[in-house]
């Protein structure tokens, strides 16, 4: 099933998930078993038009962004700043020891665990997301606020295995951004900090892609931290959408970033729709509401109660109201940075200092002088009339318009295919299947409530048959004990549904799917267990009563005597408690829902790094070379001459012979745009150099000395600040030649090399509709080869894809810092910023 999106339109974030993820949660993660018919022809045209308009407005406000929407992919240790010099993000690859992430993953996977039953009931792959640590629970129906999450409460012993990862992450945060770490550390209440860190809460996500959002509820004067704990995948980079940059992350990588900037995940880079992949990530943050007065008063109330009960295990004697700062939950202001290959390289931490100052100077020069950019790289940063952007209809949508949320009237749709699907899945509510997900106590409540209702239905049916032996339809008495037993059974079923979805807010389409299966299960039980005739109860009757339950149940409750109202409330609480005590990942059972104990920090224990022979968090953070002041300071101005070497492919004696180009829509897209036509008509850009000389030619541009040389030529033993290898690898063959080429020219760069190449992959390769992708693949190599041959006068051309080029860079002993994509380039040009690997 193709990727879909769960659309959640609400004013407030669902606090069972990371606050601020309030508009979309993508599928690959959320798939509805009934999505293909829930919004079918039963919706009239006017309603569909209104729903479509609302859907499109929501998509505009909170879209998904793909990799092609961003100009830069950061891979190495990176400090990215906005135009005012404020740090927006710090990427640190391989930041965490693998043993720490492995230990934490073993525990935190349980926080997002879903059983196979959930997928069986609703189809697809479960959206796995959960919270750990402490949470305020405001805006949720949970009565007791400002406390441990249920996961932490139920996994006290296992929780300790997360502490090394917490310590390493906190130490990295402190080393990189010490001022913000101190502010956050000073604000977080001691009762809710996780293991002495400035974090109160973790959000754990598995197989999760987010749309553009800001994190509502995070501490304004701090940074959030994202770490990938485990996984096998490509793509899903964290993108800062207003800045056009992505941070590529793999297991053990850490990203410190301003969570109040709009950010999202790019697409999964897997061409097969059913590709196997997994990714477990963790967000560390301080939930600012935990430091506000209502929560502080709750801590004090619990402490006072514990003292009155003469508790002997108190971890605190008093609660301090700290300065929590001003937390507006507003998006951060955006100060865009014009992006060039030089500004991209200047963000590399390895190039800080003198190199970054030079790169910043070069960035300013090419911004002021577009012809200098063309002189250096062969084309401008952006070509307005070049390779056209993909139209939306050419791309596989993340979402389906059929998922538009409609007004919900309770119950379920009675279309034929929906009823058939419900009947096919009714057995998932059988006792033996429920036991796979829920504890014995809750399954017993379900069984007892179900049996009680069926007994009352049987008794009523037998009475109706005695009165009228020819009766074929059951008559439902709304004032009978059977009706109240049905509502009680619905209360149990509702908790079953909440458990299956992990206590997150349930989409109305999912809810309809569930109630359809519930009704089919009961209708089948009426036939096979108490001997009613086919259709005597019927799906329609049960649907009517389910709508009555969803919209009329509270009215009946208010009409009941006070003592009956109280009994019903207690009953619902009893059901919820039983469901929450279901064993997940062998957790210890606990009465989390009613827990009022002052149990803050009771789970905390010290980690003995020396005894375990683990690197200390402080020493681990020192590996990255952050100065005492952190990464805040911007680089100074460059002085003196900057030397740049441009290496060009040597032209052959003649242009590639004109060949017959394919004719298709994709071929026309590549060959007939105005920029491509200019390349075909212009003189090759490397003809100006003398082909008879193997020596370099020097051009002076202010304090920039530019040498140009053909591949194979000599520079007389000189070293250069920067080397630009302009489309050299496309002129090499086999595996050995490109590696030798890379080794030779990158060795002449003091700081870094720009490897500029044609990328045969379409920028939307992984999300192109199959028919478009196939047509593109059939013509791309011959078309781009013709354009390259016209540009560089080459007979033989060997164009490659980004994955292939990255492999060459790695095998040649170089490290990739970033990739820059030239927007609209007729050659689909990319520039890789690489440097020699330190020995």
Curated annotation (Swiss-Prot):
> Which reactions does this protein catalyse?
thymine + 2-oxoglutarate + O2 = 5-hydroxymethyluracil + succinate + CO2
From the UniProt entry, list the residue stretches annotated as the region Thymine dioxygenase: 86-288
Q: Name one GO cellular component term.
A: nucleus
Q: Which UniProt keywords apply?
A: Dioxygenase, DNA-binding, Iron, Metal-binding, Nucleus, Oxidoreductase
- The annotated region (DNA-binding JBP1 domain) lies at 415-583
Cofactor: record remark: Binds 1 Fe(2+) ion per subunit.
Q: What happens when the gene is disrupted?
A: Does not affect growth, gene expression or the stability of some repetitive DNA sequences. The genome contains only about 5% of the wild-type level of J in their DNA. Cells lacking both JBP1 and JBP2 show a complete absence of base J.
Q: Could you tell me the Gene Ontology terms of the biological process aspect for this record?
A: base J metabolic process
Please name the GO terms that the record assigns under molecular function: DNA binding; metal ion binding; thymine dioxygenase activity
Q: So which cofactors does this thing need?
A: Fe(2+)
Query: Where are the residues marked Involved in J base recognition, conferring specificity towards J-DNA as a site?
Result: 548
Q: What does this protein do?
A: Dioxygenase that catalyzes the first step of DNA base J (beta-d-glucosyl-HOMedU) biosynthesis by converting thymine to 5-hydroxymethyluracil (HOMedU). DNA base J is a hypermodified thymidine residue found in the genome of kinetoplastid parasites, which is localized primarily to repetitive DNA, namely the telomeres, and is implicated in the regulation of antigenic variation. Also specifically binds to base J-containing DNA (J-DNA).
Write out the similarity annotation. Belongs to the TET family. JBP1 subfamily.
Query: Quaternary form?
Result: Monomer. Binds to DNA as a monomer.
Q: What is this protein called?
A: Thymine dioxygenase JBP1
**What high-level taxonomic lineage is stated for the organism?**
Eukaryota, Discoba, Euglenozoa, Kinetoplastea, Metakinetoplastina
